[in-house]
């Protein structure tokens, strides 16, 4: 069974991707910090044998690195992002933290693990 990581797997697009992959028998590791844009759609699959959920901010590089190293996924779908333009104008800091710094952390983890795992990164913007 191919392992994949989905960051932001509890948002609107993420839940649909996670459920699509589960139905196709992938082992899915969902990483999400469960902010305002999360939903509980994945509750229906939480007991599936091919699904794991970790409440985690992708800015936590140490834990992110650990999960990638442990599961050695074949692909990572990066959907983790702060959304809603209005919110970004009123308070841009969380958007910069997740959308830029968090993505950088993910890239750094993959760079540091490049000799240990062969993984494809699919970045959704």
What is the predicted role of each segment?
Residues 1-125:
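N-terminal Rossmann-like NAD(P)+-binding domain of SDR-like oxidoreductases, especially those catalyzing
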